């Protein structure tokens, strides 16, 4: 019997054909003969105590001019699907949380949800990394300016960032003697009402912020180094960085081995680790990317490896 795979994502018509990781996953699933069903966040709902969706059958194509075709909308229980990929991009807001509640109902009805809804709620992408202090640069989370100032005085060169940012937004570098620290803290903490993260600056960022993809707790053999544009301290592609695929180093594999068992335990089947130099900086659990860039550089099939892992999970049930 064919696997019925649903996906919750941002509008498929607006994705970047060349870079979109969700499309890579869908192409891999379709190549296995699986049936695809498309949903956007607003299509999820609950009726008569059951999680449901207005979903549409989906076909995908390796064609930059026409990469998808949608069928007629149908109203169905999520329990009729075998697996659901939650690929809605941040922001991680209350609407995202409500979506995880609905997906958790589907999970309780026997659907495999990738990634596990509870873990999507629990694992803030910046805070999650602090569970592995042996892997991270000196890090502080606080909303009190005096505590943050003590940290910046100790480390002299630091990165300050919100806990809920994405794509490199609102990330500041502060160095000793910079007169702008007060306004940076006022802005990021919203006058002391919001927790933020401070990390000791890593000079290795000039060589790239590496995205290491993890499938069921095991690393893909290659990563994508996102190298900052001239004059930048952020490697994010959304902030103008350029991507360069590379093999993993021994240190990368060590970090992956430290984190992998926890990912498996939490049902986080597809995850992106962010590593600068020798240090883990973030663990991305909501809609990680960079599949297409690594596949293009090394002729890998990361989407296929993910579908293999999903297939194993389904058969083990």
Swiss-Prot record:
Protein keywords: ATP-binding, Glutathione biosynthesis, Ligase, Magnesium, Manganese, Metal-binding, Nucleotide-binding
Binding residues for ATP: 152-208
Catalytic activity as recorded in UniProt: gamma-L-glutamyl-L-cysteine + glycine + ATP = glutathione + ADP + phosphate + H(+)
Residues binding Mg(2+), per UniProt: 282, 284
Keyword Nucleotide-binding: yes
Listed EC numbers: 6.3.2.3
UniProt cofactor(s): Mg(2+); Mn(2+)
Entry's Gene Ontology molecular function annotations: ATP binding; glutathione synthase activity; metal ion binding
Textual note on the cofactor: Binds 1 Mg(2+) or Mn(2+) ion per subunit.
Pfam families: GSH-S_ATP (PF02955), GSH-S_N (PF02951)
GO CC terms in record: cytoplasm
Family annotation (InterPro entries): ATP-grasp (IPR011761), ATP_grasp_subdomain_1 (IPR013815), Glut_synth_pro (IPR006284), GSHS_ATP-bd (IPR004218), GSHS_N (IPR004215), PreATP-grasp_dom_sf (IPR016185)
Family label: Belongs to the prokaryotic GSH synthase family.
Name this protein carries in UniProt: Glutathione synthetase
Lineage of origin: Bacteria, Pseudomonadati, Pseudomonadota, Gammaproteobacteria, Pseudomonadales
Gene that encodes it: gshB
């Amino acid at each position: 019997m064919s696997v019925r795979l649903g996906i919750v994502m941002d509008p498929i018509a607006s994705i970047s054909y060349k870079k979109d990781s969700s499309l890579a996953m869908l192409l891999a699933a379709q190549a296995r003969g699986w049936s695809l069903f498309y949903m956007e966040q607003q299509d999820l709902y609950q009726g008569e105590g059951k999680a449901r969706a207005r979903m549409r059958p989906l076909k995908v194509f390796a064609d930059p001019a026409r990469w998808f075709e949608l069928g007629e909308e149908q109203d169905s229980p999520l329990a009729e699907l075998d697996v659901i990929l939650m690929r809605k991009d941040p922001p991680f807001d209350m609407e995202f949380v409500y979506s995880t509640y609905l997906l958790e109902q589907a999970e309780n009805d026997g659907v495999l949800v990738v990634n596990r809804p509870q873990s999507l709620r629990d694992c803030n992408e910046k805070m999650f990394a602090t569970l592995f202090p042996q892997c991270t640069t000196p890090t502080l989370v606080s909303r009190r300016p005096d505590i943050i100032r003590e940290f910046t005085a100790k480390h002299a060169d630091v990165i300050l960032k919100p806990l809920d940012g994405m794509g490199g937004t609102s990330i500041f570098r502060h160095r000793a003697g910079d007169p702008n620290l007060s306004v940076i803290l006022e802005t990021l903490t919203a006058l002391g009402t919001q927790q933020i993260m401070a990390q000791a600056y890593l000079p290795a960022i000039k060589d790239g912020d590496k995205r290491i993809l993890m499938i069921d707790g095991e690393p893909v053999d290659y990563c994508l180094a996102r190298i900052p544009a001239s004059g930048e301290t952020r490697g994010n592609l959304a902030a103008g960085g350029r991507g360069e695929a590379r093999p993993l180093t021994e240190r990368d594999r060590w970090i992956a081995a430290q984190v992998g068992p926890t990912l498996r335990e939490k049902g986080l089947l597809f995850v992106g680790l962010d590593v600068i130099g020798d240090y883990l900086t973030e663990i991305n659990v909501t809609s990680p990317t960079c599949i297409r860039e690594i596949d293009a550089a090394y002729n890998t099939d990361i989407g296929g490896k993910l579908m293999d892992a999903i297939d194993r999970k389904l058969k083990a049930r």
